[in-house]
């Protein structure tokens, strides 16, 4: 279980919690809690796509999360409200609803005090420092400085403290956990009630997270509580169809972080794990170690969907499966060979049984003496079990190991000795990857309880052998007997196509070598048979080949069983449903695009009309200005005075008397102004010529009334001449 954080411990002890960063506090308090004022004015530029800090519609509105004085939240961070309408954004209980509202983008949960910035984002940042997937408002931390401790509910803190102290307060040994875990437990119980097969660990190993969840994402809790996958990172490839190692894919996992499976170019045909779910539920790792929660608290909330063992019995079952399958399948393979009934009555019956016992004893010695032999023996067991089915008495033939090839040197403890012994056993083609993996773990000193070298693969019931084409592309043979196997493949295939009339002679040693080579060169990845020799081996048995059987055990019928047909029908219905959903989505998108195109055309038309109106108004303005200018020029050409005259009045006899008096007074004022101007002009001109300005002073009178030319020609002052004498 997760440990109590510092902020949570502080809240539990009664001390004030750690102060939030300004950016975190702003988002927790204000993000999508107020309506955008620019949107009401139709001016918000962040509406499409919707990246606005405030909400535009009610279904985008987020309630502000609060932690009350009693230590509880105003609404749960995990349990969704069943009354909330996602289309209208309305809840009958209003803001006082104690449950989570599934708003657009699930903002109430992502930006809750319990979850906001408490986890690291898996996506990178761009040049501006924004998340390339979620943009500016990413609810996950980008870097250690952006992380914040979660603020927990008092009930969750009490449950965590009880788990840490080993005090289980719930009934039947179940602790009083937070509401989110309780909701997951309720979902698991509902799934087990609907389909009891999930209680079987073999069914969980073969089907967990291999099919897409039929429920909509918003109506499922997802996570470990749902046995179906919801995204590519949650998906697990079906181990019955795909064969891959328990090693993480280097293209997907970097360090401790699992990336997107789409990063791998190999896709589903990749030989490595693409997710944590694929690795934990891999047949080599599943139920191979004890569950940590069961070890510490005696309770696991994941129940049957846990990838780790809950009891010592399940651990023992995992370790015994390979040996049990090896012994049972070896016996069935021997008893199902043609001519075995005849040899039972022969004198060599004891030697045959002794040979079989010696094979098993040598395998046991090999697995005990050599540190890397456990993976080899378990791979052989799993391959034999998978080829014959789990718990079925199928007469399908598998060639057995020759007795002369099995003795090993118990003192050989080096890699060279192990590989050399494997070559002597004709096992060089089986599980080379597990040898490399075990060697790496021995070099690194991984001897803990979670070491993969000590885990045995789990038999997957109903697993189908691979086709020759898949085997040739995924498993490369390095044995010196591979060329011999290939040379023998032609006649063996031809003999397999025809019913055998008598047992083939297996007396010569080359034939024995070919049989052993063909048997163990077919053991591909993780010890699962996957070559054409599985089909060839059917020629030595009166029963059909396992490659023609689709059920968990070989049968005389070549048609698939009802479960397989039901599964195919479900997949077909699911594909049809997806196609219908895609068609509906495409129709909606097409209608939206058509509406946007119509709006764009209308906007362009309105802009064109407005531009033409503007051009017309400018043209009219220029015409009016030109007409005014022309009238002014005509008035100047007529030479009319600015003073009002009688010519503009027309017949003055028709003018009323008051207006005539007003006109008279105005004309008098104008006349006086004209007289004043005339007097001033005359006072400046010469009295004699009245053309030039006066400038000469006459003597002795000192009058300045004549210009210089007139003063020279006139001896007397004209001003004094016109004046009477003073006496």
Swiss-Prot record:
Signal peptide: none annotated. Its EC number is 2.3.2.-. Ubiquitination is enhanced by activated Rac1. The presence of the RING finger domain is not essential for ubiquitination to occur. Residues 330-339 have a biased composition (Polar residues). The keyword Aminoacyl-tRNA synthetase does not apply. InterPro entries: Unkempt-like (IPR045234), Unkempt_Znf (IPR040594), Znf_CCCH (IPR000571), Znf_CCCH_sf (IPR036855), Znf_RING (IPR001841), Znf_RING/FYVE/PHD (IPR013083). PROSITE patterns: ZF_C3H1 (PS50103), ZF_RING_2 (PS50089). SUPFAM superfamilies: CCCH zinc finger. Keywords: Cytoplasm, Metal-binding, Nucleus, Repeat, Transferase, Ubl conjugation, Ubl conjugation pathway, Zinc, Zinc-finger. Ubiquitous. Residues 463-495 have a biased composition (Low complexity). Pathway: Protein modification; protein ubiquitination. GO terms for cellular component: cytosol; nucleus. One of its GO terms (biological process) is protein ubiquitination. GO terms for molecular function: transferase activity; zinc ion binding. It is found in: Cytoplasm; Nucleus. Gene3D superfamilies: Zinc finger, CCCH-type, Zinc/RING finger domain, C3HC4 (zinc finger). It comes from the Eukaryota. A zinc finger (RING-type) spans 686-721. A zinc finger (C3H1-type) spans 75-104, 115-145, 243-277, 285-313. Belongs to the unkempt family. May participate in a protein complex showing an E3 ligase activity regulated by Rac1. Ubiquitination is directed towards itself and possibly other substrates, such as Baf60b/Smarcd2. Intrinsic E3 ligase activity has not been proven. Although this protein contains a RING domain, intrinsic E3 ligase activity has not been proven. This is Putative E3 ubiquitin-protein ligase UNKL. It comes from Mus musculus.
């Amino acid at each position: 279980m997760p440990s109590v954080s510092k902020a949570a411990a502080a809240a539990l002890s009664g001390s004030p919690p750690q102060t939030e960063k300004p950016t975190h506090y702003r988002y927790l308090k204000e993000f999508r809690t107020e309506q955008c004022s620019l949107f009401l004015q139709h001016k918000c530029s962040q509406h499409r796509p919707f990246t606005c800090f405030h909400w535009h519609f009610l279904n985008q509105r987020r309630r502000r999360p609060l932690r009350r004085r009693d230590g509880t939240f105003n609404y749960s961070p995990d349990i969704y409200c069943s009354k909330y309408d996602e289309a209208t954004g309305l809840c009958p209980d209003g803001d006082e609803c104690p449950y989570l509202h599934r708003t657009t983008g699930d903002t109430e949960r992502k930006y809750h005090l319990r979850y906001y910035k408490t986890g690291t984002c898996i996506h990178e940042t761009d040049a501006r420092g924004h998340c390339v997937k979620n943009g500016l408002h990413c609810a996950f931390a980008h870097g250690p400085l952006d992380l914040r401790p979660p603020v927990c509910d008092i009930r969750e803190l009490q449950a965590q403290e009880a788990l840490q102290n080993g005090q289980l307060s719930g009934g039947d040994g179940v602790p009083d956990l937070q509401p989110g875990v309780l909701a997951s437990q309720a979902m698991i119980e509902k799934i087990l009630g609907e389909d009891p097969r999930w209680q079987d660990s073999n069914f969980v190993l073969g089907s967990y997270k291999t099919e897409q969840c039929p429920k909509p994402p918003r109506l499922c809790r997802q996570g470990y509580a749902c046995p179906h996958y919801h995204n590519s990172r949650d998906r697990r490839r079906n181990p019955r169809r795909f064969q891959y190692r328990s090693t993480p894919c280097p293209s997907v996992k970097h360090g401790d972080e699992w990336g997107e499976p789409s990063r791998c170019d190999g896709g589903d045909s990749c030989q490595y794990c693409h997710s944590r779910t694929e690795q934990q539920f891999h047949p080599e790792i599943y139920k191979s170690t004890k569950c940590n929660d069961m070890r510490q608290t005696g309770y696991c909330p994941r129940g049957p969907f846990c990838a780790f063992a809950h009891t010592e019995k399940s651990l023992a079952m995992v370790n015994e499966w390979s040996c049990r399958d090896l012994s049972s399948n070896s016996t069935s393979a021997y008893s199902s060979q043609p001519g075995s009934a005849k040899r039972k009555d022969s004198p060599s019956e004891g030697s045959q049984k002794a040979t079989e016992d010696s094979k098993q004893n040598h395998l046991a010695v090999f697995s005990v003496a050599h540190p890397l032999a456990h993976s080899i023996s378990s791979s052989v067991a799993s391959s034999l079990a998978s080829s014959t089915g789990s718990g079925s008495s199928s007469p399908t033939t598998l060639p057995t190991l020759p007795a002369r090839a099995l003795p090993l040197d118990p003192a050989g403890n080096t890699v060279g000795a192990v590989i050399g012994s494997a070559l002597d056993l004709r096992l060089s083609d089986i599980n080379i990857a597990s040898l490399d993996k075990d060697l790496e773990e021995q070099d690194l000193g991984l001897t803990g309880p979670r070491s993969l070298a000590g885990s045995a693969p789990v038999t997957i019931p109903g697993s189908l052998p691979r086709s020759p084409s898949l085997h040739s592309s995924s498993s490369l043979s390095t044995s010196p007997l591979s060329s011999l196997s290939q040379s023998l493949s032609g006649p063996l295939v031809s003999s397999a196509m025809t019913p055998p009339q008598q047992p083939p002679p297996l007396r010569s040693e080359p034939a024995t070598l070919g049989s052993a080579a063909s048997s163990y060169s077919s053991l591909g990845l993780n010890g699962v048979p996957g070559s054409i020799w599985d089909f060839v081996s059917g020629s030595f048995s009166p029963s059909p080949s396992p490659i023609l059987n689709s059920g968990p055990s070989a049968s005389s019928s070549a048609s698939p069983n009802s479960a397989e047909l039901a599964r195919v029908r479900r997949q077909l219905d699911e594909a049809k449903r997806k196609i219908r959903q895609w068609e509906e989505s495409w129709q909606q998108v097409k209608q939206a695009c058509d509406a946007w195109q119509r709006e764009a055309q209308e906007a362009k038309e309105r802009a064109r009309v407005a531009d033409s109106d503007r051009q017309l108004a400018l043209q009219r303005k220029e015409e009016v200005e030109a007409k005014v200018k022309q009238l002014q020029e005509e008035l100047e050409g007529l030479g009319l005075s600015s003073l009002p005259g009688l010519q503009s009045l027309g017949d003055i006899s028709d003018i009323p008397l008051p207006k005539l008096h007003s006109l008279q007074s105005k004309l008098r004022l104008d006349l006086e102004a004209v007289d004043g101007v005339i007097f001033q002009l005359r006072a400046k001109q010469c009295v004699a010529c009245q053309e030039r300005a006066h400038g000469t002073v006459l003597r002795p009178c000192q009058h300045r009334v004549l210009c210089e030319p007139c003063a020279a020609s006139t001896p007397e002052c004209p001003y004094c001449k016109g004046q009477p004498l003073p006496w």
